[in-house]
Design a protein with these regions (language model features):
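N-terminal lobe/hinge region of extracytoplasmic solute-binding protein
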Residues: 36-92, 123, 191-195
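Detector for C-terminal structural segments
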Residues: 41, 52-53, 57, 204, ...
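Surface-exposed binding/hinge segments that line
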Residues: 8, 22-28, 100, 119, ...
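Alpha-helical secondary-structure segments
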Residues: 34, 114-121, 153-159, 196-197, ...
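Extracellular/periplasmic solute-recognition and catalytic clefts
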Residues: 134, 148, 201-212, 229-290, ...
């Protein structure tokens, strides 16, 4: 098995090179890619952040052991290619994953990359090292990791407590770069050092992030760009006008609403625009330990009060999708089909019938037209959060709940919900990896840091482990759908809808592939070039 998989990696690399060779003749070196950003991150440390505005700009600073092919639109297990690894192999019992490593790779400060760096990174992620991450949002991904062992300087093995076929996909995410052993987590927050195609230059909060070409990159003749500059502008109308005026080459993927995309196409017909299935869901989180929301009947009433289709119609011109925890098809590989989704509590289209039940429950709990429940609805201070939060507040009025909007700066948002410093909130959750292990472990298992509302059902945890071990994909999907139903029955985190955002770029920008089932995994940027 080991020999077969390593050979596969080599052959796959040769095939990619052969396919790419003719196109390479037209590619040009040079130029700075100008991109606007919708917000300012708290730090530059991917492993300590949870928002795309922290991950995407510095994905090009790093490399992974393996990565989803940057030119395949839909992430899937067959689209994983080696990066700092040269291949991989599983043991017969599925509990050991071994990577031979690329030699001659240097960190941006000139020090050599070795197996020690891989071990250091996953010791940090698993919480087993002396130094600790200040925040470790994806620690739950590695709860099944027994440890990482080095075999000399250029081979590592991941030892698991039990089989977990999805581990390779987790390692292929943009959230899974290798960090250098010799740079502290503290320093990585302000000046990250990687092995990737671009070197970090500068981060000025609320202003810009700048990257420059890594002249010593291990992949020869890459990257094509001399650098990338991200400018932070929070006003949607302003940034769209600036893009149309030629100030930027590329919009921030997913941030262009359907109406704004129409504006760009009307005013700048030469622009190339795409609207892909959304992999980010808008959801309702309720602090289950904060009275009166510790009452499951009240939480059920709030879930029944939602008119999901209204969100889609108002915010996406009807182009968004209704879905559960797992991204629905056709963009997602694991989500429930519509006919199954509509059988879940609250997910059917009988809105008025559901709201009548919700009002009956609220009256039984002592609320009504003359005694309305007053709450704060917290959300992140960006349009993609604020706009649906306003609709949520309006809908809750139908069931005797009056909400007051509380907006929170991005740098404070995730720490706030992680420590459960809220009562009711509207949140957005992206599909980091389109696989049940990622979303279920990170957001729904007992005690996970991404489980912002404190949901805990030991029976669900057992099911999550069971599906994680299952090698048969169809059997695993059936288990994942069973978990979806239990989460809906528990009102764990009602999913409202999946957005459908757009992206546009100037015609001289080449080499972009926009992925349909993750906003996080397609931004290594080494193959993007400017036809100028």
């Amino acid at each position: 098995m080991t020999r077969h998989l390593r050979s596969y990696a080599v052959v796959a690399g040769l095939l990619i090179a052969l396919v790419a060779a003719p196109a390479a003749l037209a590619q040009k070196q040079g130029g700075i890619l100008r991109v606007y950003m919708i917000d300012s991150p708290a730090s530059m440390s991917i492993h300590e952040e949870s928002t795309v505005v922290a991950e995407r700009p510095v994905m090009g600073v790093f490399n992974n052991l393996v990565l989803f092919d940057q030119h395949v639109k839909q992430n899937n297990p067959d689209a994983i290619v080696p990066e700092l690894a040269t291949g991989w192999s599983w043991s017969e019992d599925g509990t050991e994953l071994t990577f031979p490593l690329r030699q001659g790779v240097k960190w941006h400060d000139g020090k050599p990359f070795t197996a020690k760096d891989v071990k250091c990174t996953w010791d940090l992620l698993a919480g087993r090292s002396e130094e600790k991450f200040r925040i470790n949002p994806r620690k739950a991904w590695y709860r099944n990791l027994e440890g990482v062992a080095t075999n000399g300087d250029y081979e590592v093995s991941f030892h698991l407590k039990r089989p977990q076929p999805a581990l390779l996909e987790l390692l292929a995410s943009g959230w899974s770069p290798v960090y250098p052993c010799h740079v502290s987590p503290r320093d990585m927050r302000s000046h990250p050092i990687g092995t990737g195609p671009f070197k970090f230059v500068e981060f000025k909060p609320n202003e810009h992030i700048r990257l420059t070409r890594n002249e010593d990159y291990w992949r020869k003749d890459r990257p094509y760009l001399d650098g990338v500059e991200y400018t932070m502008l929070k006003n949607r109308s302003t940034v769209i006008l600036a893009f149309i005026a030629g100030k930027y080459d590329l919009t921030f993927a997913g941030s262009v609403t359907i109406p704004l995309m129409h504006d760009i196409q009307n005013q700048m017909p030469e622009a190339i625009c795409q609207s892909n299935p959304g992999s980010v869901n808008t959801n309702l989180i309720i602090n289950r330990s904060a009275p009166p929301f510790d009452n499951p009947d009240l939480r059920r009433a709030m879930a029944l009060g939602l008119d999901r289709k209204a969100f889609v119609d108002i915010l996406t011109e009807g182009q968004g999708n209704l879905g559960g925890v797992l991204q629905p098809p056709p963009g997602g590989l694991w989500g429930l089909p519509t006919e199954v989704l509509q059988t879940l509590p609250g997910y059917g289209l009988e809105v008025e019938k559901n709201r009548a039940k919700a009002r009956q429950t609220m009256q039984r709990l002592g609320y009504g037209p003359e005694n309305r429940l007053k709450i704060k609805v917290s959300t992140r201070d960006t349009p993609s959060y604020r706009d649906p939060a306003v609709i949520l507040i309006d809908q809750l009025k139908q069931i005797y709940i009056d909400g007051e909007l509380e907006t929170v700066d991005t740098t404070r948002w995730y720490p706030k919900v992680m420590r459960k410093d809220y009562t009711v909130a509207l949140n957005l959750t992206g599909s980091t990896v389109d696989d049940p292990d990622q979303g279920l472990y990170e957001n729904y298992t007992c005690g996970a840091i991404g489980n912002y509302n404190g949901y805990c059902n030991p029976e669900v945890d057992k099911l999550v482990d069971r599906q994680s071990m299952e090698a048969d994909r169809e059997k695993r999907k059936a288990l994942a759908w069973e978990i979806e139903r239990k989460l809906a029955e528990d009102d764990a985190r009602p999913i409202i809808y999946y957005n459908r955002g757009g992206i546009c770029w100037r015609p001289e920008v080449k080499g972009i592939t926009v992925m349909v089932n993750s906003i996080y995994n397609g931004w290594r940027m080494e193959d993007i070039w400017l036809d100028k």
